């Protein structure tokens, strides 16, 4: 073995050792040890793989880590080139992928990052209830760590928080597969943390979560009461944020309303942008059903879709589940046809969960007037009274959450105000709630009073 080859082998060994800081030892032995470093010329590392699958797998999963490790060893930012063997031509360098390479299912790349490719911005039905959150999510997906960091999405179960978080991750990976993205629930984060402590692999756990470019962590409220997990996530958050990495979180409440979480964590959740997703109005619920129906080769009467949309009001996941049940029954038993009576029978357990009476704007206005000790006539007047501004916005916000009326219809009930005023009120109160626990608690109390009386 000549000296040059020996030197190259030593350099490659150093690179592999450096890679162990960010990649498991098992992965190094499987994918990198069989690789041979042929040359280093003009800031290019020419590598030889024993089989095309090595090139494919490294390029798909570890290229950014390999470039980083090579930079730290060589003090230069190299381009990674794989040599191909061409019959009669010896080794030939190429920067292109081998066309004949059998590729694994595309979804496996996303699954390794905790992502499900069925969630996209294209199949997220946007309405007034979610347009601000959807716009913020798209901005983050287009420019990670430059638009809003962190982005905190909140709302009740089944309204689309997970869909938007997954869409962010999928969009980023589609645009640049080398960006390190990880979606995880806070429960998974906690379980991995506990397992790492038990196995003595806490260093590897920290490398996994502190070396990534985009962290999407769902259901952050699960960390409540878990002091050591909160401590670990606090330092993970700081490491990523200080490194200008994107953080997206979701919870069932605004940050200020989260219980049993450290104040220093809640404070960090509020550093960026908070965006609430509200229950969809009837127009959006109907649009969701029609969009979902496109996945089936069935034609269901619009009156049946309206029936479902009118009765399942607060949970998109439940709405979609009802349609799935209906379509399954129709395709198996009814040759694609189903009646309203059959729909009522099939969905009786879901429909029975819905409020039997409708909450009106007047009911909301009166409850808010009681809470703020103001006159009803001032609430609905056209006059601009500063003392009434906040209560009026609170009432508009609750009207968006608890009624099926459009923005314009709500505005009409507040002295003939336009839809833009209502939308502004919705966004303002949503933002205030994320930072004012007293306001968030008051709105929660009024909501409970209104819904429990139904």
Curated annotation (Swiss-Prot):
It is found in: Cytoplasm. Residues 331-454 are annotated as: Domain IV, binds dsDNA. It comes from the Bacteria. GO terms for molecular function: ATP binding; ATP hydrolysis activity; DNA replication origin binding; lipid binding. Transmembrane segments: none annotated. Residues 1-76 are annotated as: Domain I, interacts with DnaA modulators. Belongs to the DnaA family. This is Chromosomal replication initiator protein DnaA. The lineage of its organism: Bacteria, Pseudomonadati, Verrucomicrobiota, Methylacidiphilae, Methylacidiphilales.
